[in-house]
Amino acid sequence: MSSVVVVGTQWGDEGKGKITDFLSENAEAIARYQGGNNAGHTIKFDGVTYKLHLIPSGIFYKEKISVIGNGMVVDPKALVEELKYLHDKGVDTSNLRISNRAHIILPYHIRIDEADEERKGANKIGTTKKGIGPAYMDKAARVGIRIIDLLDKETFKEKLEHNLGEKNRLLERFYELEGFKLEDILDEYYEYGQQFKDYVCDTSVVLNDALDDGKRVLFEGAQGVMLDIDQGTYPFVTSSNPIAGGVTIGSGVGPSKINHVVGVAKAYTTRVGDGPFPTELFDSIGDTIREVGHEYGTTTGRPRRVGWFDSVVVRHARRVSGLTDLSLTLLDVLTGIETLKICVAYKLDGKTITEFPASLKDLARCEPVYEELPGWTEDITEVQSLDDLPVNCRHYMERIAQLTGVQVSMFSVGPDRAQTHVVKSVWRLA
């Protein structure tokens, strides 16, 4: 039995999809455990670029099981569209399994999400307006509708009727928007469910059976630790738990069955949406990193905010997710920058702090304490191993490992699978 969790250590968009795809080659099951179609990941497979939002990266390996876990919230319409997108590209999806316990996103969730962001104005969270938060709210309030409910038309109708009474009052009286009629949703969404019903099962059984049979299972996190609803920059966070602890809740696999946790980090830092960002760059270096790194959101197309690598953030991620390994991505983007900076601590009211503050008010007042390192000019996109990297690049990686307290077991120097390199296997048994 061997299991690996892949988590983002920053604010998402770290390259988790690429690393998950790379590690999938040696896995026999790949599972997502939280989030929904608010998270986009880009994968290159057999020379073709794919952009997925719901379906796990392992879908391209027809001999491997791909799982949408119970901790996810699934937009049935988006799922059907993504399946069609893959089928149109000739991808076989018969290896997909969808948890019967996963909750679904309905049109009223999306409308409420949009209206709430609009109402908040300058205080908006910066959501993707995909209905994720409202769907998780319904789950916590115990009025959510699960995939198992969607497949039974009588149950679906009963729950939908009940919810529409409440949601329409909210939309019409509070947001002053038009509500929904039962017939606007019932038949259309029931039909979506019928289109993917053959994939639906108890995925906890599937995953535990795989582990008990000695198979390798890979858990794919979405977003990142700093967007975790408990451990992130609350309230500028997502509505679920991307940290490694979310695996046990969102997949139905116990913590004793998790072996290694791989934290994926960019060689710099990015963020989409609002909230404090201590190392954010507003100069030409930031612009260069954004353009060279193609830093635009997969889901929204929004330009990402760019900053220097923040070891305070990744140390926090190490602690709350129990990182055993670090995968450093987009090293090639930093090529040509004469002097690189790593944030080693913050200054808050004249005092140096080395741990990430819980208070956003404090975080907004934090000034980064930087350590400067010489950059490199050599093209690193064709290197085949750690030893091939320029000395300054290796020193940069070594310093990150020292400051974060996590060994760098993988690094990538470009978008292709062949540009990801292993220093130490994360599938090791010890």
From Swiss-Prot:
Mg(2+) binds at residues 13, 40. One of its GO terms (biological process) is IMP metabolic process. Its EC number is 6.3.4.4. Keywords: Cytoplasm, GTP-binding, Ligase, Magnesium, Metal-binding, Nucleotide-binding, Purine biosynthesis. The keyword Endoplasmic reticulum does not apply. It is found in: Cytoplasm. IMP binds at residues 13-16, 38-41, 128, 142, 223, 238, 302. Pathway: Purine metabolism; AMP biosynthesis via de novo pathway; AMP from IMP: step 1/2. It comes from the Bacteria. Pfam families: Adenylsucc_synt. GTP binds at residues 12-18, 40-42, 304, 330-332, 412-414. The active site is at 13 (proton acceptor), 41 (proton donor). Signal peptide: none annotated. It catalyses: IMP + L-aspartate + GTP = N(6)-(1,2-dicarboxyethyl)-AMP + GDP + phosphate + 2 H(+). InterPro entries: Adenylosuccin_syn_GTP-bd (IPR018220), Adenylosuccin_syn_Lys_AS (IPR033128), Adenylosuccinate_synth_dom1 (IPR042109), Adenylosuccinate_synth_dom2 (IPR042110), Adenylosuccinate_synth_dom3 (IPR042111), Adenylosuccinate_synthetase (IPR001114), P-loop_NTPase (IPR027417). Binds 1 Mg(2+) ion per subunit. The keyword GTP-binding applies. GO terms for molecular function: adenylosuccinate synthase activity; GTP binding; magnesium ion binding. SMART domains: Adenylsucc_synt. GO terms for cellular component: cytoplasm. Its cofactor is Mg(2+). Belongs to the adenylosuccinate synthetase family. Homodimer. Plays an important role in the de novo pathway of purine nucleotide biosynthesis. Catalyzes the first committed step in the biosynthesis of AMP from IMP. This is Adenylosuccinate synthetase. The gene is purA.
